[in-house]
């Protein structure tokens, strides 16, 4: 398959923001693929492989600038000036390639397979001479493709493809191309347990629909963790679950999957990023704690004070994430306990279709508690007084609140789903929203006065699952320390966009557009009708959306969440309705 077909499709996609049109373009492109299909899907995602494999080309913008200088015979300083002007390394590559007419006359057209193989070679090269090898590989691609080809290849290399589609839209296109919409829910469930779009596309094209639908948890392949709905009172939760419920501590840590096969242990975050190397103490302890041939566990990794046993908040664990050096020292200074609350696979058996009560029983009999692994504290009760007392104890112990788990016969583990089988109950903030929300940054406003030289406020958005877009819901300017405030431009630098990102829906024009990448936790006073924000626009009131009044940053950057994991538009709608219901009850 010629890469020019991919380039043509990407060019068409850049001219629309309508999800149906984007999907149609992708369907046509996918159907054009042959043995290149798996590689094609990864390139459409802007990746080389599924996230959990952690494969990256390791080529920075600076290295691309050096390579462009070599292939074009233009001084690096001049290439850097073009980069400063355009702000996008892909556009720089296109402009330079067009000016210098670099394409070799002897090279054949690029193919999808050749591009993917070359990028994989870039990613896997190591040792002395690896930088030169990557530059040489890039030069080869630059000489073989058109300026437009090079622009998109460069964006893929640097992880900045940004063609306006998410994995959800790509999955829709795969289903339409190789299956039938009536199986969408089952295929999406399979993807949630096996988040590899390239693999799923190939299986569906081969006609292996049944094997895809039957996909469950697989050791060493991370899944999308099950999520909880929210309610604001014990009575509501007990009523919703018909009195058949357990309540577990909701720990303030990092959601962690633990996969063990024989003596091999791998850890994954809720975003399917492998974190094994950052927690050598947990890996070592897991080998000593769990005596099974294979198991997959779900829990929360929480840092604690080794002298007092006091639980530290989520932010402290960030000192362990992404670290490569002095891990043993940090492990002693900031030890971790993983509080386990679920098991989805053991010794070759899929437990995802086993009711929660039985999964918990299996988990309780699996291991002996130690400093690194403990069971999430829980009670089984429908008595409001008992549950309220347990809730207060959870807050006293440094937790966020409780998670209610259904004890019904159909309380299965639903990967990636947010449903009423799990319901979270968090601290009731008086005169505030009764839960924190996680929003994606899509823009920034320059500061004035004391905030001159940095961003004074950020434009935040919810995620609209139906439209695969981000809808603005508030401007955030409160809750920042001075250190955090003045570090904002640096934090967002690589995500700045010259134009409004395709998936952002906004009537507000910020000073700086930011590509949806970073999620932050906020609290606010209430949800109100807004004539300017686009969250739920036209749903509650005609020509109006919803917004968060008096938003305040809690200090928690949700590095464990992808933008698509942020609070959804539908959740804001439900919170608004619940808020109105509560106010009505108080007045009566």
UniProtKB/Swiss-Prot annotation:
InterPro entries: ATP-dep_DNA_ligase (IPR050191), DNA_ligae_ATP-dep_bac/arc (IPR022865), DNA_ligase_ATP-dep (IPR000977), DNA_ligase_ATP-dep_C (IPR012309), DNA_ligase_ATP-dep_cent (IPR012310), DNA_ligase_ATP-dep_CS (IPR016059), DNA_ligase_ATP-dep_N (IPR012308), DNA_ligase_N_sf (IPR036599). Its cofactor is Mg(2+). Disulfide bonds: none annotated. Its EC number is 6.5.1.1. GO terms for molecular function: ATP binding; DNA binding; DNA ligase (ATP) activity; metal ion binding. DNA ligase that seals nicks in double-stranded DNA during DNA replication, DNA recombination and DNA repair. PANTHER family: DNA LIGASE 1, DNA LIGASE 1/3 FAMILY MEMBER. Belongs to the ATP-dependent DNA ligase family. This is DNA ligase. It comes from Thermoplasma volcanium (strain ATCC 51530 / DSM 4299 / JCM 9571 / NBRC 15438 / GSS1).
């Amino acid at each position: 398959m010629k890469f020019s077909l991919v380039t043509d499709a990407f060019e068409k996609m850049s001219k629309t923001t309508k999800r149906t049109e984007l999907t149609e373009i992708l369907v046509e492109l996918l159907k054009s693929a042959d043995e290149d299909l798996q590689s094609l899907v990864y390139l459409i995602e802007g990746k080389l492989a599924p996230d959990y494999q952690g494969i990256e080309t390791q080529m920075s913008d600076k290295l691309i600038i050096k390579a462009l200088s070599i292939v074009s015979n233009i001084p690096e300083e001049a290439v850097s000036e073009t980069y400063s002007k355009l702000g996008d390394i892909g556009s720089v590559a296109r402009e330079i390639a067009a000016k210098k007419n670099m394409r070799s006359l002897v090279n054949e057209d690029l193919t999808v397979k050749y591009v993917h193989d070359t990028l994989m070679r870039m990613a896997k090269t190591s040792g002395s001479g690896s930088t030169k090898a990557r530059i040489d590989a890039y030069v080869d691609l630059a000489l073989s493709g058109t300026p437009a080809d090079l622009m998109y290849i460069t964006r893929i290399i640097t992880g900045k493809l940004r063609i306006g589609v998410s994995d959800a839209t790509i999955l829709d296109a795969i289903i339409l191309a190789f299956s039938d919409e009536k199986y969408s829910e089952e295929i999406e469930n399979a993807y949630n347990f096996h988040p590899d779009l390239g693999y799923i596309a190939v299986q569906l094209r081969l006609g292996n629909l049944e094997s895809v639908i039957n996909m469950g948890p697989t050791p060493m392949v991370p899944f999308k963790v099950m999520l909880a709905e929210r309610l604001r009172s014990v009575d509501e939760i007990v009523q919703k679950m018909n009195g058949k419920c357990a309540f577990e501590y909701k720990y303030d840590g990092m959601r962690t999957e633990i996969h063990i096969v024989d003596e091999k242990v791998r850890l994954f975050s809720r975003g399917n990023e492998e974190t094994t190397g950052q927690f050598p103490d947990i890996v070592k302890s897991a080998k000593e704690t769990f005596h099974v041939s294979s198991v997959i566990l779900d829990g929360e990794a929480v840092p604690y004070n080794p002298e007092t046993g006091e639980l530290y908040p989520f932010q402290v664990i960030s000192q362990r994430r992404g670290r490569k050096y002095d891990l043993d020292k940090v492990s002693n200074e900031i030890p971790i306990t993983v509080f386990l609350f679920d098991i989805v696979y053991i010794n070759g058996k899929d437990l995802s279709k086993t009711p929660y009560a039985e999964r918990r029983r299996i988990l309780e009999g699996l291991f002996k508690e130690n400093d690194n692994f403990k069971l999430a504290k829980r009670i089984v009760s429908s008595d409001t007084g008992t549950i309220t007392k347990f809730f207060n104890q959870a807050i006293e112990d440094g937790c966020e609140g409780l998670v209610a788990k259904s004890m019904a016969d159909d309380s299965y583990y639903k990967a990636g789903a947010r449903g009423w089988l799990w319901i979270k109950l968090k601290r009731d903030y008086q005169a505030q929203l009764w839960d924190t929300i996680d929003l994606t940054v899509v823009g920034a406003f320059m500061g004035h006065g004391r905030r001159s030289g940095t961003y004074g406020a950020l434009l935040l958005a919810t995620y609209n699952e139906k439209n695969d877009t981000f809808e603005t819901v508030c401007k955030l300017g409160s809750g920042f320390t001075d250190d955090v405030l003045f570090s904002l431009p640096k934090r967002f630098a690589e995500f700045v966009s010259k134009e409004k990102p395709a998936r952002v829906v906004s009537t507000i024009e910020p000073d700086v557009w930011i590509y949806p990448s970073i999620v932050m936790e906020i609290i606010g006073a209430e949800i109100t009708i807004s004539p300017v924000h686009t969250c739920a626009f036209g749903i509650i009131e005609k020509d109006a959306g919803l917004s968060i009044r008096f938003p305040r940053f809690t200090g928690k950057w949700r590095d464990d969440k992808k933008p698509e994991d942020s609070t959804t538009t539908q959740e804001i709608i439900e919170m608004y309705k619940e808020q109105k219901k509560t106010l009505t009850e108080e007045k009566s």
